[in-house]
Amino acid sequence: MFVKKKSICELEKCYSIAPFQQNGAPRFLVAAEKHAPCYLFSENGEKLETVWTEPGGVMTMQQVPGREDQFLATHKFYSPNDSAEARIVIATRRGENDWQIRTLVEAPFVHRFGILQRNGKAYLLVCCLKSGHDYKDDWTKPGKTFAALLPDNLDGFDETHQLPLTLLKDGMCHNHGYSMYFDHGVQTGVVTCDEGVFQFIPPENKQAGWQIRQLYDQPVSDAVLCDFDGDGEPE
């Protein structure tokens, strides 16, 4: 295999990257953690479009299921000490270099989120690093994890009509890491914090609730579940 490294763009404080399927072709999104743009690239590294020029503070981006013109992203998470105005936004393509950006939900200190699908429904899992602070580097107010059923159509949401969130778990200091894990064919969220590693399992149906399993009880920054040794069990 021959690999060639090349510079495709200059982006100060480049932080977040996400795959994006558009017109049947693989693309990828790149955004920054500070006040900087978000760009859409072809799989070959050609810069195709500017999605936004500001405000930045992007920790996470994910395409909306079933949409080739829409994704969700965090905005205004600049640092643990400067993220009280953090939120999740909806980016919808209206034309070339023409993207509409609307607020889906204000979620102070939101660091990670994920969209999980189960039995034809999509769920938003929202992970907030902490729940407040009174001074710099204040970690006395632990983070929380929220969830919401994600409607098929997001056109009705904006800053004055936000998606309601339901608290799933609090007391999560340094609620930092998130990854998606297929558990026997079910998409689940793996969330990490000082209290350990927790697996969030979406409802099986309308009558069921979320399941939360603690997988580990020591402080963890980030985690990925994988069957490394081939024994059929994740490590």
Placement of each model-derived feature along the sequence:
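Beta-propeller-forming repeat regions
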Residues: M1-E235
